[in-house]
């Protein structure tokens, strides 16, 4: 079983890197199908039943794409850290400034 690794340790590393690369490529390929496919248009001269089926599929597709996501993304206002606007506030006692040369 280990006859393919009978050479040096470098060949084992090459095999492990190749396997890791294959696993990474397969995991990326599965991530591409995260969104559903767009429904196919039935054409201009399609019967009413096909058009109704198509419109239902489009409505379902739009509902899936635009659904609300719950969790950290439900904030109504964007998160801005307070230290960015710290100088714009009137309270400067918590952030003293040394403008005099006496400290040197």
From Swiss-Prot:
Secreted listed as a keyword: yes
Listed InterPro entries: Pancreatic_hormone-like, Pancreatic_hormone-like_CS
Family: Belongs to the NPY family.
Name of the protein described by the UniProt record: Neuropeptide Y
Subcellular location: Secreted
GO cellular component: extracellular space
Tyrosine amide carried by residues: 70
Keywords, alphabetical: Amidation, Cleavage on pair of basic residues, Neuropeptide, Secreted, Signal
UniProt GO molecular function: neuropeptide hormone activity; neuropeptide Y receptor binding
Function (record text): NPY is implicated in the control of feeding and in secretion of gonadotrophin-release hormone.
Biological process (GO), any one: neuropeptide signaling pathway
Tissue expression per record: Lateral brainstem, dorsal spinal cord and retina.
Leader sequence residues: 1-34
Gene: npy
């Amino acid at each position: 079983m280990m006859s393919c690794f009978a050479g040096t340790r470098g060949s084992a590393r090459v095999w492990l890197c190749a396997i890791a690369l294959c696993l990474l490529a397969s995991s990326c390929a599965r991530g591409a199908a995260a969104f559903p496919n767009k429904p196919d248009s039935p054409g201009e001269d399609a019967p009413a039943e096909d058009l109704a089926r198509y419109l239902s599929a489009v409505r379902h597709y739009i509902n899936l794409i635009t659904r609300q996501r719950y969790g950290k993304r439900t904030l109504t206002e964007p998160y801005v850290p307070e230290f960015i606007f710290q100088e714009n506030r009137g309270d400067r006692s918590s952030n003293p400034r040394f403008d005099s040369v006496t400290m040197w």
